């Protein structure tokens, strides 16, 4: 059963969270957030595979992610979903006796613009022979078409978008070489040269032959394997990359990476990197503005949990959750989810337990997660997907509605049967796939059919979505990267300011739609929009109509 609804106060000085009645008993706090299962109606017939007869290793239990990205530039976010594939007996103790034909693989679903999708995987050339885990999207060559980086066991693959509906594997040509188990990645322009660089997170030195007698079902955990170093590749702005792992200082740290995201947490104009590790201290790499990073997680208060122990971190999200104008950090976890309030002093205060958010999910294992205004009331909400860790134990999922001033309420039981339906969730990605102004979600379920959750909330407020287009192209060599990754956007409406930074990856093994979504509540228009581009340019727009997708071009910004 779900816990009673919480009033969650995101200030450490306020003390323990106080229980309040269920939302349906409190009219002024009644939630309108609702989701419906739209999987069948949308035509997304995807089933994930972990490649064996039963879960028998860390590799099989990790799961896979997804990404929303507009690969054909028609204004409708398309969906790429990852899967494991059939494992040979050398990689599993429980091989399939009758492997499926064809083998399980990734799928690309083209958005038809009417709420339905068409599987175009083979046409696009996006069916690799890979046990895939995570995916991120970025226009690495600034040609106007979004490319893909797929990570998995044994290698990572860089797909170039050819602009005609097809993709080409350019991994070797681009100089991307990642061995071992690359589990996640993110894109960032760490040197602000207008070309996005690539960070690849690696998990452990997985050995399928190793068995731990003391492990449950002879299933070794992350600490039974050696950790790995992550990789940082500098974009040379010519379609190739250079491995700068050691030069940047990233290579000095060995972890067990699960999730990674990058954003300018300290507001100095340069993107930093947060690495969520499993059973190992987390990393926060602060950008030193000279091509190198310093690891400050301990000093910043994000290396360990409140008990001083390493956490089982999964999916990190940077967002201004407490409304302070600074980027806070939300991390899903196998035990206690963590909400870390940015203290404005190059650090964070862990308020997850004090707020009650951590306890609300303590009985679950949390994986995919997103921080969005699901009801467009001008306040950020949090959605979390759960599932068993080492067994296929399905769990229900969670929705926390933002109430303002750092307070949240658990409204999961009122959010629709698709939220309370138990699955073994892993990666999740978020987008307004039908362009109705409400954020939807897609979740990959381990070894089972995936779920498309359509946001059908009623009585919602106004909204605006912003698509950024940096000035740099494959012919123009000045300005910000084409995707606007690293840009920070302020939206002012009805006297309130909201801040969102354009990031690449977010949550667990996944990436959300690149358009920045702002719920506006009753505001009849947007008073002001300010874009702080990575190039240093600042662009202001005033008196903008709401309830639409707005494209902002850096080429129109003052020089």
Q: Can you say where each PLM-predicted feature lies in the sequence?
A:
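Beta-propeller blade termini
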Residues: 63-73, 110, 131-146, 160, ...
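Asp-box/WD-like beta-propeller blade repeats and closely related beta-sheet repeat scaffolds
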Residues: 120-140, 145, 150-190, 200-223, ...
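Repeat-based blade/solenoid architectures
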Residues: 44-65, 102, 124-136, 175-186, ...
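Short, conserved, GDST-rich strand-edge loop motifs in beta-rich repeat architectures
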Residues: 82-101, 202-225, 384-393
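Beta-propeller blade signature
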Residues: 105-111, 228-235, 286, 397-402
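Blade-edge beta-strand/turn elements of extracellular beta-propeller
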Residues: 35-38, 116-126, 166-176, 239-251, ...
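Gly/Ser/Thr/Pro-enriched helix-cap/hinge segments flanking short amphipathic alpha-helices
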Residues: 42, 52-53, 359, 389-393, ...
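Hydrophobic beta-strand segments that make up the repeating blades of beta-propeller
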Residues: 79-83, 143-152, 198-202, 268, ...
């Amino acid at each position: 059963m779900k816990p009673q609804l919480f009033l969650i106060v995101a200030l450490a000085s306020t003390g323990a969270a106080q229980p309040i009645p269920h939302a349906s008993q409190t009219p002024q706090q009644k939630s309108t957030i609702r989701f419906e299962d739209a999987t069948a109606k949308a035509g997304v017939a995807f089933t994930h595979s972990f490649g064996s007869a039963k879960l028998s290793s860390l590799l099989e239990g990790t799961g896979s992610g997804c990404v929303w990205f507009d690969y054909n530039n028609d204004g409708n976010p398309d969906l790429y979903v990852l899967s494991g594939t059939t494992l040979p007996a050398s990689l599993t103790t429980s091989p399939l006796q009758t492997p499926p034909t064809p083998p399980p693989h990734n799928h690309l679903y083209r958005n038809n613009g009417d709420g339905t999708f068409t599987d175009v995987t083979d046409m696009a050339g996006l069916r690799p022979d890979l046990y895939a885990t995570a995916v991120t999207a970025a226009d690495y060559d600034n040609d106007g078409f979004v490319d893909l980086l797929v990570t998995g066991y044994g290698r990572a693959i860089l797909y170039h978008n050819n602009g005609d509906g097809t993709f080409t594997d350019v991994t070797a040509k681009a100089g991307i070489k990642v061995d071992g188990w690359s589990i996640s990645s993110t894109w960032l322009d760490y040197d602000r040269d207008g070309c996005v660089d690539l960070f690849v997170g690696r998990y452990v030195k997985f050995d399928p032959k190793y068995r731990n007698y003391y492990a449950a079902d002879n299933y070794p955990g992350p600490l039974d394997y050696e950790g790995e170093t992550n990789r940082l590749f500098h974009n040379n702005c010519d379609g190739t990359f250079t491995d700068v792992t050691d030069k940047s200082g990233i290579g000095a740290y060995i972890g067990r990476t699960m999730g990674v995201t990058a954003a300018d947490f300290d507001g100095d104009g340069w993107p930093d990197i947060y690495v969520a590790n499993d059973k190992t201290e987390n990393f926060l790499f602060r950008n030193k503005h000279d091509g190198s990073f310093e690891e400050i997680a301990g000093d910043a208060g994000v290396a360990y949990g409140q008990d001083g122990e390493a956490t089982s971190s999964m999916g990190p999200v940077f967002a201004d959750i407490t409304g302070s104008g600074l980027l806070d950090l939300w991390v899903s976890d196998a035990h206690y989810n963590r909400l870390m309030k940015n203290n404005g002093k190059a650090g964070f205060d862990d308020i997850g337990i004090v707020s009650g958010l951590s306890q609300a999910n303590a009985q679950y294992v949390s994986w995919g997660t997103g921080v969005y205004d699901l009801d467009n009331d001008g306040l950020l909400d949090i959605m979390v997907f759960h599932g068993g860790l080492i067994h296929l134990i399905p769990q229900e999922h969670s929705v926390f509605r933002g109430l303002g001033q750092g307070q949240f309420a658990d409204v999961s039981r009122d959010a629709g049967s698709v939220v309370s339906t138990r699955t073994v969730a892993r990666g999740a990605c978020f987008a307004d796939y039908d362009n109705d102004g409400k954020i939807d979600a897609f979740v990959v379920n381990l070894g089972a059919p995936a779920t498309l959750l359509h946001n059908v909330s009623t009585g919602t407020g106004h909204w605006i979505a912003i698509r950024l287009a940096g000035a740099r192209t494959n012919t123009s060599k000045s300005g910000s990267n084409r995707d606007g990754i690293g840009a920070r956007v302020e939206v002012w409406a009805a006297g309130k300011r909201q801040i969102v930074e354009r990031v690449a990856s977010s949550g667990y093994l996944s990436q959300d739609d690149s358009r920045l979504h702002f719920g506006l509540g009753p505001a009849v228009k947007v008073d002001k929009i300010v874009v702080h581009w990575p190039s240093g340019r600042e662009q202001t727009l005033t008196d903008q109509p709401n309830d639409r997708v707005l494209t902002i071009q850096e080429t129109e910004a003052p020089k």
